[in-house]
């Protein structure tokens, strides 16, 4: 996206779709929609814009009112950006186990960050955010139930995909899910306008809630009333809370999803690194997981198939996580040898 804009929020969306050249099997064509090109580096910038602007239009959000949300980080970062641009104080409630980069980014944007114990899981952070909202008269974004979440993807992400592939094949669309906004919003349009496109989602292999088949118990307002019995802690940050969000439930109930592919954390880490080192695409853990699922589809797809996947964020907010566990900060033995192979500016090697 290029040009002049009245504020940073106007730059959300219109992200590039990039061909995969080195990692794609030879019999198919693979594309990736790189959501790191959003202003704060993730697909959740769309959600943040959509929810806040819908609440402004409905009158539910008043000028200067504090916004609060339970988030694994990317939604919080997006909301911190949108709220800063529009003049709303923002409070994020986040489980203590998510990366410290997320906390610092939100605080740098002026947000307050409340941490909840890991034992309380995602349900605990949601309950805490709801409690604080009710006690203080704050607006809660409710990303897991808010229809504006999927609506913004139907209005933006899906239309961008349709425009990019107008008159061309698009055999498979692959996306992970956190809230379900991307998969549901895009699927609405694909089912209506490209019904032959197969829609594939993916989830952690140790927390395969959709694959499990058991229903999510819900409160009267559609929010989850408890943790799903198939959930277990996993390392793919931003994916699959301990419940099936209402926004994702639409994709289940309406039969949008053709296949669910479980992916392990180890495969996710390795695939994210492969995207960086083979394609130059720097992205996070859930991107590695999504692309691993897309590769699974590609390997089984008929000759000539065209596969599009979403890569939801950037890798920089994972520096403190296991994604970077094998990446050295100091020079390796090979690098020391290279440095010493010519005489100029040789660093003294520690003893």
Regions found by a protein language model. Name each.
Residues 1-351:
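PLP-dependent amino-acid enzyme catalytic core
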